[in-house]
Amino acid sequence: VGRRLTSDVYDAYAYKLGLGQRTGVEVNEVVGRLTKKTDKNYTSSLDIQAAIGQGNTVVSPIQLATYAATLANNGTRYRTHFVKAILDTNTGEVLSETKPEVMDVIEGNGNTFALVRQGMTLVPSTISGKISSYPIAIACKTGTPQRSETYASGKHYLNAMMIAYLPAD
């Protein structure tokens, strides 16, 4: 699928989901990058790698959180914030409140987002540990990002990660 889509199409959707760009969060953040045909090391095999989040693709944890929230919101991407409101500790009065700001909307193709969300709700049952029996329905996706650095043996370092949102319903 990655070869047929090519990184051009894949990157366009990844960008709309919040990857490869600033999220708008209130603190400094890294932009990351998406694999592009203009990359110096580009070959068509990078299209396949980019489709699974590898190749020259680099994303930040806050971009992944934005991505998960966009899936949860049926393709509507909101500006990401760490703070919903600032309250006066003495009175409880709201001093400042963050208003939702739509950054992009991905027009779904039929029930695409529903299928993705449904798949994400099945993942916890495949994971051992407390997440599989958590009392609130969780939607998640696991991954194993590969780093460019290698061990002396030549094997790549791997990082375990997971994006999630709850409640899943």
Language-model features and meaning:
Residues 1-169:
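Beta-lactam-recognizing serine transpeptidase/beta-lactamase-like catalytic domain environment
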